[in-house]
Amino acid sequence: MPTDEPSKRKSILPTIPTSLMLKKSNEALSDFERTFNDRVMDIFAENRRIDVEEFKKNAECFLNIIRSNKIDLNWGEGGESRYVTITRLMKILKTSPQSIKDLLPHNTVSNFVKITNYNLTIDITLLEELVRTVIHAEESYIKLLPFSENSTEISSYSLQDFVATHFIPIMIEEPENPVYYTAYAVGTIFFLLGARRRDCVYLKDLLASTLLLQLEECIHAENHCLSPPKIDVFTVAQFRTTLSEFRFLDSQRKGLLAPADLKFFRDGIFNEVFTKRIFEISITYEDGRIDFKAFVDFVTALKFRHTTASAKYHFEILDLKDDGLLDEEEIRSISSFQLQNLPDYVPEDNSVNPEVATAELRDMMRLNQNGITLEEFLANRMNSTFAGFLSNSDDYMKYERREQ
């Protein structure tokens, strides 16, 4: 068992040595080994609860000292924001418990100063949010332990069980199909964590992403009839919209979509080359169809198009040769199809010669003779505009009219 005392702990998410634990999904585990795993988890979780309670007391005391100091507390020009000077913060940290010192290493303090950008001070709201998210991560970690594989990972199925156990019951208005909701929420989480094709994600990545906190805030907003949070993807309303789109496209009512079904997705704005590739990069089932999870991947990629996960997804679709390079031939092929199949409502004077479009897109992505790699695509700030131009007529028109 680990002996990570709060005073010595550097990481907020310690893990049990892997030599002690085997993955739950290992079918070779005996009943004794499974019982042993559960017991280790229980003891570990109880120790973590004690640590969290102590950290919460220390954090509240720290914030109270920050808030109560009138000499070094600045209120900003508008009188709305509260700031603490670096000098004062350093003095307070000197006498703070080790857990608080670990919370604010030098690089974190430096980043907060840059974000605040006001006379070498830190906006106290940043400190409050940091404490809130760390406490939420710690408490979520304890709740996740019984569902995790070995204290470090959790599978998609176990995370669905976790959502069903801890989130569905607190919804005032439950989704009509909780199983689909958990699949939707977990599918979104796995996609945004870049784990679309993986069975498990690391708990540290899950908690660092704050996606579970966003899920909780969505439920809180709907329960209390508040405005949806900025990231509203986990609201029941958004889930219903996605499920309704899926059911509308499911022509055979089998819970699966064929390539022809996606022709009607969002009024048919996505070109056929693009939508067919979705089936080539996803797990398919009967007659090459995709299920709700693959559809959620697609919808999430569109909703969060400025994320790394979405950029990777679009690169994979546009890489027609599946060789890890996006070259001029592929761009020409997709752009030619896109330009030749624009909707009828697009004026003819907005049409562009495919060669001109290819040259413009090539310059946009700084394409070399061999093409560009995924890493180069991710590093290019225009990748979202590029992907939109090649995938759907709406983004194509926005780009063409950008100077009007």
UniProtKB/Swiss-Prot annotation:
It is found in: Cytoplasm, Cytoskeleton, Microtubule organizing center, Centrosome. Disruption phenotype: RNAi-mediated knockdown causes defects in spindle assembly characterized by kinetochore microtubule instability and a reduction in centrosomal microtubules, a decrease in outgrowth of microtubule plus ends from centrosomes. tpxl-1 recruitment to centrosomes is reduced whereas microtubule-depolymerizing kinesin klp-7 recruitment is increased. GO terms for cellular component: centrosome; cytoplasm; protein phosphatase type 2A complex. GO terms for biological process: cortical cytoskeleton organization; embryo development ending in birth or egg hatching; microtubule cytoskeleton organization; mitotic spindle assembly; mitotic spindle organization; positive regulation of B cell differentiation; protein localization to organelle; regulation of dephosphorylation. Keywords: Cell cycle, Cytoplasm, Cytoskeleton. The keyword Cytoplasm applies. GO terms for molecular function: protein phosphatase 2A binding. InterPro entries: EF-hand-dom_pair, PPP2R3C. Part of a complex consisting of a common heterodimeric core enzyme, composed of catalytic subunit let-92 and constant regulatory subunit paa-1, that associates with a variety of regulatory subunits which confer distinct properties to the holoenzyme. Interacts with rsa-2, spd-5 and tpxl-1. Regulatory subunit of phosphatase let-92 which recruits let-92/paa-1 complex to the centrosomes, thereby regulating microtubule outgrowth from centrosomes and mitotic spindle assembly ensuring the stability of kinetochore microtubules. This is Serine/threonine-protein phosphatase 2A regulatory subunit rsa-1.
